[in-house]
């Protein structure tokens, strides 16, 4: 088995943008909230054999901190507040929050502690698992291998779009969590910046800083999940989450995620007030065409011109799906496409891991993610899941 005597994650900013955006909101609104998150491998991979390597890597992360150059970079964004950035500069990973073990070949990870601290563990841990697994399973693969296949895909893309107006096409790298490796992600995004005019940014703050492109991201499911136990009324949990985000960011970072419960449940709460203030919404599960059509109808019903809003698609995209969705929607509404695993771990003979880390508790009580794809439901408490479905009028079937 390949051993690592060096840290794979080398900077605090090697993470997804929405983690830092959510962390700031938690820092100001929920400093004393405690959460628990757990790892799930949705595939049939036995990853327990890597537990000790991961423990070593996580131990190395205790020394990570924001450098002066990174701090100065972060101050360039108007939505980051001085108090938060000053705190972030002093932040250190608390390794004791992460418990890792192997049971019957399966990898088990449980992370618990203050939400403002726990929130930064998910992305680097998933990236570590993916890189360690692929480094051992496919050691012959290099960044050059990934670039060669990317060039083939780009050639097909340009052939397919020869007669399509791509002047409104915008694509973002969303590939940190399940990347083959950091080197592969960096090389891929660098190549796209150099030869693909439709790349507008990356969800990875470190890569965005190094390559001088825009960091992109707003909030994740955990923002909505935690609010299921923060407020006093479960039915109003999405409304509270949406409102708190507006309090924090006002005219910035205005893309809302729709599938923490379901799109229908989200739209019930996404009233004229929210639909007007938020720049747009993000798709992460379910049929993207049906979802997009629902979004258009909702904006029209509220009297909002869809051309002033944005749909961000981010569920299991590849270049072929992007072309199809772009053709379907770009004349009706602004569209952005976040492409992840099919960008940073799309290499012949390499099977990406289907892994997640999700919140399971907030303040000692269960939380859930339901989504528009039954296979993506995540909750450890069946009674709470049933109650959540009843409150939001969602079917429990296949969940």
Swiss-Prot record:
<feature type="modified residue" description="Phosphohistidine; by autocatalysis">
    <location>
        <position position="221"/>
    </location>
</feature>
<dbReference type="InterPro" id="IPR036068">
    <property type="entry name" value="Nicotinate_pribotase-like_C"/>
</dbReference>
<dbReference type="InterPro" id="IPR041525">
    <property type="entry name" value="N/Namide_PRibTrfase"/>
</dbReference>
<comment type="function">
    <text>Catalyzes the synthesis of beta-nicotinate D-ribonucleotide from nicotinate and 5-phospho-D-ribose 1-phosphate at the expense of ATP.</text>
</comment>
<dbReference type="GO" id="GO:0004516">
    <property type="term" value="F:nicotinate phosphoribosyltransferase activity"/>
</dbReference>
<comment type="pathway">
    <text>Cofactor biosynthesis; NAD(+) biosynthesis; nicotinate D-ribonucleotide from nicotinate: step 1/1.</text>
</comment>
<dbReference type="InterPro" id="IPR007229">
    <property type="entry name" value="Nic_PRibTrfase-Fam"/>
</dbReference>
<keyword id="KW-0597">Phosphoprotein</keyword>
<dbReference type="GO" id="GO:0034355">
    <property type="term" value="P:NAD biosynthetic process via the salvage pathway"/>
</dbReference>
<dbReference type="Pfam" id="PF17767">
    <property type="entry name" value="NAPRTase_N"/>
</dbReference>
<comment type="similarity">
    <text>Belongs to the NAPRTase family.</text>
</comment>
<protein>
    <recommendedName>
        <fullName>Nicotinate phosphoribosyltransferase</fullName>
        <ecNumber>6.3.4.21</ecNumber>
    </recommendedName>
</protein>
<dbReference type="InterPro" id="IPR040727">
    <property type="entry name" value="NAPRTase_N"/>
</dbReference>
<keyword id="KW-0436">Ligase</keyword>
<dbReference type="GO" id="GO:0005829">
    <property type="term" value="C:cytosol"/>
</dbReference>
<keyword id="KW-0662">Pyridine nucleotide biosynthesis</keyword>
<dbReference type="Pfam" id="PF04095">
    <property type="entry name" value="NAPRTase"/>
</dbReference>
<dbReference type="InterPro" id="IPR006406">
    <property type="entry name" value="Nic_PRibTrfase"/>
</dbReference>
